[in-house]
Amino acid sequence: MKLRCTKSYFNLPVAHMQWFDTNETGEPCTGPCAKWHGYDRSVHFEFAGEPDEHGWIVGFGDLKPVKEFLEFYFDHTALIAADDPRIEKAIQAHEDELVDLRILPYGVSMEMSSIFIWEQVNPFIYSVTDGRSYISRVECREHEKNSAFIEIEEKVALKQGKLTKRYLQQYTTWRRFVKPGDILKKYAK
């Protein structure tokens, strides 16, 4: 029997910028979303799997590392995409302690954030549930009006969950910062 449960995390104030946003000239980095702006994000997980001997899909007490991971990336931080042409300036702002920068490999949109979070957290869930459970959906909300989500088929989620490494693109600038999998790895069985 496949059961599902959910867990939500709120109050993740984060700034981001999307370099590809344009103004009426059509030039990248000129639109309003190309500048730092922020939202109070929330992340909502749906877990699926077989219940354990207590009847739980996921023990919510086991999710403290997930909260730590989300707070590291999305709590009072500034996000930038790894392919943003202004990345060196953002890194300089981080080094000057003007922002607490986090570099996301695919982009900072809700869609790309959903993928990033799923890739990092699903192997952890697989590990702490001894392979019984997986993340079937991750929804990222930037506020009450806008959200995006990723839904994953069971066989894909379980196959990815078995992997011990994360498939993140390794940009030169990325290496100066904590790799996301390192945060959760210390908690995995």
Where do the protein language model's features map onto the residues?
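Charge-rich, low-complexity N-terminal segments
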Residues: 1-189
